[in-house]
Amino acid sequence: MTIPDKQLAAVFHTHGGPENVKFEEVPVAEPGQDEVLVNIKYTGVCHTDLHALQGDWPLPAKMPLIGGHEGAGVVVKVGAGVTRLKIGDRVGVKWMNSSCGNCEYCMKAEETICPHIQLSGYTVDGTFQHYCIANATHATIIPESVPLEVAAPIMCAGITCYRALKESKVGPGEWICIPGAGGGLGHLAVQYAKAMAMRVVAIDTGDDKAELVKSFGAEVFLDFKKEADMIEAVKAATNGGAHGTLVLSTSPKSYEQAAGFARPGSTMVTVSMPAGAKLGADIFWLTVKMLKICGSHVGNRIDSIEALEYVSRGLVKPYYKVQPFSTLPDVYRLMHENKIAGRIVLDLSK
């Protein structure tokens, strides 16, 4: 395969809205030590990409930036020292691009909180380009049974909600409450939870999302635009409160309510990060009910392998729509307006 010197990429030079995204010709990078060059075939679009564009997180992003961190493609070149991967391997490029491998966190398989972590599409250029640099240690090998367009959303959305469900400590037959259940992460969380024998209370709005999450195994769907008292509705559905809550909604109000959904002794896992959102937990009831709050922003390398295994076995099926790469600005607009059910996957060939 001939690798070109230049390629098309979606670049933004300043923070702002979809109009700031420009399709430009940029150089194809050379893989360095322990790196590979991946020809990206498909990439998902995540809400984190919107935060990177808008610049509304306290973590600064590099500028100019090529966003994207749900890439699936083929290794076309390997850098010095790479033995794990070879040309032709099908791999995924994730939010976590690399970590140091030597700190106390990496040594405990907690590389997601490595102080030297590099993030695809945020601190380093990501997957909104035809050829992307990936760290050979962190690139995830995609099973042959999983199509690349299916694997793309798993690289962030799937891994993230799978790890968060593990953090919830919810056991078989117990209730997990998922605000934001109809979105890109949420519809996958419903499926992973079902595959892990949890019972699901899904919170979102709209008949299309209700139908979607019920088809994936949610026992209860609560529409936040129709329920007069969401906390009481969750308690009624679960006979006293959920054994765990997974907050995936991008609405700050979800965090104001989430502690109220909880059964005594349960765990609330914070995943989504709406700009400026605060946790609305009454300290008295947090203490008396012995509630636990756990942050979980992404999974590690073994979580990535396990998350793909569920897909390979047919237990999890991303709900997605493939669109041309050229439609990325429109996807940002729809995402900002909360009008996307499931995931949008971009075809880099179009």
UniProtKB/Swiss-Prot annotation:
Its main location: cytoplasm. Its EC number is 1.1.1.1. Zn(2+) 2 binds at C100, C103, C106, C114. GO terms for cellular component: cytoplasm. It is an enzyme of class 1 (oxidoreductase). Zn(2+) 1 binds at C46, H69, C156. CDD domains: CAD3. Binds 2 Zn(2+) ions per subunit. Homotetramer. Belongs to the zinc-containing alcohol dehydrogenase family. This is Alcohol dehydrogenase. The lineage of its organism: Eukaryota, Fungi, Dikarya, Ascomycota, Taphrinomycotina.
